[in-house]
Amino acid sequence: MKRTACIMDLKNIARRRVPKMFFDYVDGAAWTESTKILNVQALNDIKFKQRVAIDISNRSAKTNLIGSSFRIPLAMAPIGLTGVIWPNGEIITMKACEEFGIPYCLSTVSITSLESLAKAASEPFWFQLYVIRDRDFVKRLTQRAEAVGVETLVLTLDLPLSGQRNRDIYNGLSSPPKPTIFNLIDILRRPAWSYEMLHFRNFNFGNLKGHVTNLERGKSLAEWTNDQYDPSLNWQDVKWIRDLWKGKLILKGILSPEDAETAIEVGADAIVVSNHGGRQLDGAPATIQVLPDISNAIAGRCEIFVDGGFTSGQDVFRALALGAKGVLMGRALIYGLGAGGQAGVQKALGFIAHELETTMGLCGVNSVSEIGPHNLHAN
């Protein structure tokens, strides 16, 4: 990783190192992947307004998110199956985030369980929750999160059923992975990954193991998710979670001002403007396109995060200028993990921070609180 300069360099290394079915799980999106592509294109279309002859010698990207101070306005987005990208992937990604100074969010469908991650943590981490059919299990999962010291719950709302991700179907992705000829050949072509994973051999969802019996029998991921996610999920369920959870509550998956208003009504401390990275509804707008309208509707009544297509510190600047308090990044940091483990995640975070701080300087900005629409050229 010595001769790397940006997230795309780490992505290319990860693509070569990680078996295709696992890389595609992270990198892929729903159907034609048009929304994933649009997320990136829409960000690139936003141009900065450069300013000169302004003292920028004391600039800082430090910020407060959900009542805590962090080095930059960034959080690790929840990503499932991180532990198959690198052994103990969730743990070492969390450690990289802790050392750098940003919050880490554990996914419900992680390889590492809440309890195992908590044993390795030195700072409180966030936990992302899916509402599945078994409400008693959902309740117990929130109680487990509280018991290990989680202070911020991220409730995902845009997955009442699973979007079709064609790459996962083509690759036959399952948990644990099925030993098909294609997959075995692909794994043999990745000796570095195979060597690292040889003694790990954990490919099940740590938070769900023992709860879903088909999980251990290698049921396909698409079949499993369609069986477990609950299409009856509604705002009364969200209110139920709000009543259960005494800590901070972030609602993820908001794409309209109307849903943002309802999120505030049920007691959300923050929302995430998100299209699930294009992994759910292909054809949905880019998150950066809908962010301004949602920000105007919220008018400061809760914090706004955004995700979807963000791969650089410049993208973070764009989001802040259009009304976000912070950005969640998933794929970008997992590319770092796949390229070089904990050191790769740290490298990715370093790229993002440097890009953000440099862009701030060239736009004449000394603190993230100064960033606004005036720093962008009107389209």
Map each language-model feature to its residues.
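Short, conserved beta-strand segments within well-ordered enzyme catalytic domains
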Residues: 47, 62-64, 73-77, 103-107, ...
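A gly/proline- and charged-residue-enriched helix-loop-helix capping module
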Residues: 99-120, 124-138
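Alpha/beta catalytic cores of nucleotide-metabolism and tRNA/nucleoside-modifying enzymes
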Residues: 1-44, 286-306, 311-379
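An N-cap/entry alpha-helix motif that binds or orients negatively charged groups
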Residues: 1-68, 176-233, 369-371, 377
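Short beta->alpha linker loops
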Residues: 30-31, 108-112, 133, 255, ...
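Alpha/beta enzyme core
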Residues: 81, 95, 120, 136-306, ...
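Glycine-rich active-site/cofactor-binding loop and its immediate structural neighborhood
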Residues: 71-109, 114
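Short, basic, glycine/proline-bearing loop/turn elements
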Residues: 75-81, 124-130, 222-224
